[in-house]
From Swiss-Prot:
It is found in: Cytoplasm. GO terms for cellular component: cytoplasm. Keywords: Amino-acid biosynthesis, Aromatic amino acid biosynthesis, Cytoplasm, Transferase. This is 3-phosphoshikimate 1-carboxyvinyltransferase. The gene is aroA. It comes from Xanthomonas axonopodis pv. citri (strain 306). Phosphoenolpyruvate binds at K26, G99, R127, Q174, R351, R392. Catalyzes the transfer of the enolpyruvyl moiety of phosphoenolpyruvate (PEP) to the 5-hydroxyl of shikimate-3-phosphate (S3P) to produce enolpyruvyl shikimate-3-phosphate and inorganic phosphate. Its EC number is 2.5.1.19. NCBIfam families: aroA (TIGR01356).
Length: 440
């Protein structure tokens, strides 16, 4: 979708007020469909994210012979075929924009008896895949990439996999998950040790589906040959989507919002710690557990933020929230320093460069480094922002527009539907000044 046909005009609205139901967690939705498809029996998924990425994953499993019913937009009923019941696809498997889908599927499909090809959109086709194909090759998998290690992935079936003790050079939940899923089919035990703990959605959900798996922060181990038992999953609200409203309510004077039943996986919530370090007023109420995941209502009130040094230990736990954090830093008094975040350069866009360039366009001083940036808080001006088709960049600058002295035009926003369908409507409902222009 070209920037000229679909963009936002963001300008100051009102103080943000309301109680919000954020769409379901994308990471949990991907895994819920995958594991339900591999389980013995029928699983019901409630709170499923009806976004393009998760629809791509569900469509892939339909092509692999799994029957999936859709009683409502946020519900899926999955008729599992068992770990050995997937059928050979008759066409390529299109992951769309979903890096999670492609990397996890690489681990799963590497163990099947048939060949398959995983493709993605223009953005996903630029993303690095050797971090996944490397350890899978150590297990005996045969996966071919482009010469530069990017998709498409040609997965050769019929390989006998063996367990490995993998010491990952990168802190990536997707790499860990791909190895663990291949490990379900491998001879012997498979373990993953990480340089820093990452999100443990895969471990928690495999356990919910009856798999015996030992895991602690930074480590996971399972043995091959186990089966999955069907189970019903309630998907929590997506923290990464909630993040935009958490930041917006923190920086727009007079705001007070409640975000209901948000997933608070401890490996996901680094943004809360970072914002609290900057002086944010964020309360947690009604703690519960959904599908093995901790959830709570978040009560966010406006508070003046001050710049801070963001601890590197928080970086893996907020890697998707940095676009929102950069806007909080721009609104804060003083300097905010981010280091240890080189991973941001290989997301849907080079998010460090995109955020730095965009904030400079709006008059904010940003000193970029190879693995981070120093953001100098100040007054946010007007300008035209290129989101580079990155949904999180687009939503971050919609927040910036709420503090603008004029207006912020955010181009190329169609991809917001990959993770947060209906973001613009929900934002308008709580008080954002936000208009959608052009054609979808």
């Amino acid at each position: 979708m070209s920037s000229s046909t679909h963009h936002w005009i963001a300008r100051r609205g009102t103080a943000l007020q309301g109680s919000l139901a954020i769409p379901g967690d994308k990471s949990v939705s991907h895994r819920a469909v995958m594991f339900a498809a591999l389980a013995d029996g029928v699983s019901q998924i409630d709170g499923f994210l009806e976004g393009e990425d998760t629809r791509s994953t569900a469509a892939i499993f339909a092509k692999l012979g799994v029957r999936i019913e859709t009683p409502s937009a946020s519900q899926r009923i999955v008729h599992g075929v068992g770990v050995d019941g997937l059928q050979p696809p008759t066409e390529v498997l299109d992951c769309g924009n979903a890096g999670t889908g492609m990397r996890l599927l690489a681990g799963l499909l590497a163990a099947q008896r048939f060949d398959s090809v995983l493709v993605g959109d223009a953005s996903l086709s630029k993303r690095p895949m050797r971090r996944v194909t490397g350890p899978l090759a150590q297990m005996g998998a045969r996966i071919e990439t482009q010469d530069d290690g990017t998709p498409p992935l040609h997965v050769r079936g019929g390989q006998a996999l063996h367990g490995i003790d993998f010491v990952s050079p990168v802190a990536s939940a997707q790499v860990k998950s791909a190895v663990l899923l291949a490990g379900l089919y491998a001879q012997g035990e498979t373990s993953v040790t990480e340089p820093h703990p990452t999100r443990d959605y895969t471990e928690r959900m495999l356990s919910a589906f009856g798999v015996e798996i030992d895991f602690s922060p930074g480590k996971a181990r399972l043995r091959g040959g186990q089966r999955l038992r069907a189970t019903d999953i309630a998907v929590p609200a997506d923290f990464s989507s909630a993040a935009f409203f958490i930041v917006a309510a923190s920086v727009v004077p007079g705001s007070e919002v409640v975000l209901r039943a948000v997933g608070l996986n401890p490996r996901r919530t680094g943004l809360l710690a970072a914002l609290r370090l900057m002086g944010a007023d964020i309360g947690e109420e009604n703690h519960a557990e959904h599908g093995g995941e901790p959830v709570a209502d978040l009560h966010v009130r406006y508070a003046p933020l001050r710049g801070a040094q963001i601890p590197e230990a928080l970086v893996p736990d907020m890697i998707d929230e940095f676009p929102a954090l950069f806007v909080a830093a721009a609104a804060a008094s003083g300097q905010t320093v981010v280091t240890g975040a080189a991973e941001l350069r290989v997301k849907e866009s080079d998010r460090l460069a995109a955020m730095a360039t965009g904030l400079r366009t709006l008059g904010i001083q940003v000193d970029e480094t190879p693995d981070g940036a120093t953001i100098h808080g100040g007054s946010i001006g007007s300008g035209v922002i290129e989101s580079h088709g990155d949904h999180r960049i687009a939503m971050a600058f919609a927040i910036a527009g709420q503090l603008s002295m004029g207006q912020v035009q955010v181009n190329d926003v169609a991809n917001v539907a990959t993770s947060f369908p209906g973001f613009d409507t929900l934002a308008q409902d709580v008080g954002f000044g936000l208009e959608t222009a052009g054609h979808r």
